[in-house]
Amino acid sequence: MSTYNWDEKHILTFPEEKVALSTKDVHVYYGKNESIKGIDMQFERNKITALIGPSGSGKSTYLRSLNRMNDTIDIAKVTGQILYRGIDVNRPEINVYEMRKHIGMVFQRPNPFAKSIYRNITFAHERAGVKDKQVLDEIVETSLRQAALWDQVKDDLHKSALTLSGGQQQRLCIARAISVKPDILLMDEPASALDPIATMQLEETMFELKKNFTIIIVTHNMQQAARASDYTGFFYLGDLIEYDKTATIFQNAKLQSTNDYVSGHFG
């Protein structure tokens, strides 16, 4: 790896009208340690972008910065701009909870509430004051349909979500996240705990979801990135090295380091 010039970058950009979210000079620190090193990146609307790189490359830390999940870590500090609809959501006066309604998150392992399937979807809406059962029913059905789960659970909505399979639980978590109608859905290795069949079902769900949402996914699975994304960004040691169309990254990467990583020669 000593032969690579890590200062050499190739970063795709988009016309402003196509951009759903962007970052400018984003750094993330854990105490005095710099985990993310000044990343400029744009995400195209209604596309799936995969973030890849070795363990410790910073891709999950960067993803978590996009809706300020790093705020939950006492020693974490994020600098730079995270721009959504022209607003820097990294500013201290931003209401983080309101912002996360627009930029949602699905975590690595399914984390359904210990409630019914129905109340997993309605819980946040009920807390926000929605009481009309017809409205709640519509939210549940629409969200579960979008997450490709409705047909499997429509007769069991009042059963515990914990009785679902791992793949079904993850799609329920997706349904819960999209029920508040975010523009952007962040996914941190959402298939890592799933078997191959559930993984394929999740990817098929993602293809449908991108009609209505912009999806940014972290994955260690090169085959998944190649299959399921429109764009791919390669991270290494806290830096974005190459960002381009997925087909280009996997078939004709501009940088030797990227080509060697996706072909399994290091990492």
From Swiss-Prot:
The gene is pstB2. It catalyses: phosphate(out) + ATP + H2O = ADP + 2 phosphate(in) + H(+). Belongs to the ABC transporter superfamily. Phosphate importer (TC 3.A.1.7) family. It comes from Streptococcus pneumoniae serotype 4 (strain ATCC BAA-334 / TIGR4). Part of the ABC transporter complex PstSACB involved in phosphate import. Responsible for energy coupling to the transport system. GO terms for biological process: phosphate ion transmembrane transport. The complex is composed of two ATP-binding proteins (PstB), two transmembrane proteins (PstC and PstA) and a solute-binding protein (PstS). This is Phosphate import ATP-binding protein PstB 2. SMART domains: AAA.
